[in-house]
Regions:
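Short conserved AdoMet
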Residues: 32-33, 52, 101, 115, ...
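Short, glycine-/aromatic-enriched active-site segment of Class I SAM-dependent methyltransferases
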Residues: 122-143, 147-148, 152
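A short glycine-rich, Lys/Arg-flanked "PGG" loop and its adjoining helix->strand segment in the class I
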Residues: 104-116
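Short N-terminal helix/helix-N-cap motif within the alpha/beta-hydrolase-1
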Residues: 101-105, 132
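A C-terminal cap/extension of S-adenosyl-L-methionine-dependent methyltransferases
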Residues: 165-250
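Conserved N-terminal segment of class I S-adenosyl-L-methionine
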Residues: 1-84, 90-94, 107, 165-167, ...
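A short His-aromatic
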Residues: 95-99
Length: 250
């Protein structure tokens, strides 16, 4: 069962999640220098090809995600990476800061390993698009951020910050719409919000089941979506699917 929390396949209804992750690397490569890149929470290794010919080093806490990657990888918590200070020109952290309760430690670690003039790019889902005002719906997420919260998080460790939005095409938004409606129906079945009392592991199973059922439907839109269905923009960031923060070191 796969939800897109860790994009491991482009098969079937999971193709849009795969393309969304790949597009983040491709679109954000423009901010990076030519030197070595540290990829925090790298998963199965999109950066190896998408950021080439730069040297990339992948960091992930899950050893199985790193297995078979033809590059240097490090099994480690991205909040405490066993590499020296000022050892990379760039850092990327794609869809990862939301998976720890203290994302400020991830941002501080990215700053620590960067050389003067370095750049870090953080991509995370937009809370205003996928969440509720008072609740994180994705049980795999410890935090979800709006544009100003992300700006503040990165500004605490970096000398300059730019926040942009990663937007989906009309086709991508049309694919997401039924999932949002399904989630709304599920929430209406629990008007007393009893779900908030359930253990996180139970919520994760329920979430997996709901999205897996949604993505198994025969939807030609899923197969048609590619990286060309995503774009970066500095306007109307609050409406974006994902948020992109570019932190710069003086």
């Amino acid at each position: 069962m796969v939800t897109g929390e860790r994009a491991v396949t482009a098969a079937g209804g999971f193709n849009p999640s795969w393309q969304r992750h790949v597009a983040a690397y491709e679109l954000c490569a423009r901010f990076l220098g030519p030197g070595p890149v540290l990829d925090l929470g790298c998963g199965v290794g999109h950066s190896f090809e998408r950021l080439a010919p730069r040297e990339t080093v992948g960091v992930d806490i899950a050893a199985e995600a790193l297995r078979g990657q033809a590059r240097r990888t490090i099994v480690a918590d991205m909040r405490a990476v066993p590499v020296g200070d000022a050892s990379f020109d760039s850092v990327v952290c794609m869809h990862a800061v939301e998976h720890v309760p203290d994302p400020e430690r991830v941002v501080a670690e990215a700053r620590r390993v960067l050389r003067p003039g370095g750049v870090a790019v953080f991509v995370t889902p937009n809370r205003l698009t996928f969440g509720l005002p008072d609740e994180i719906l994705d049980p795999y997420h410890f935090v979800e951020l709006d544009p100003e919260q992300l700006r503040g998080l990165v500004a605490a460790s970096f000398d300059g910050v730019e926040v942009l939005g990663l937007f989906g095409s009309e086709r991508m938004n049309a694919f997401l719409a039924p999932e949002k409606r399904l989630m709304g129906r599920v929430l209406r079945l629990d008007p007393l919000a009893l779900r908030r009392r359930l253990p996180r592991r139970v919520l994760q199973r329920l979430y997996d089941t709901t999205l897996t059922l949604a993505r198994r439907r025969a939807d030609p839109l899923a197969a048609a979506i590619g990286t060309h269905d995503f774009s970066l923009a500095a306007d109307r960031v609050a409406e974006a699917i994902d948020l992109v923060a570019v932190g710069r070191v003086a």
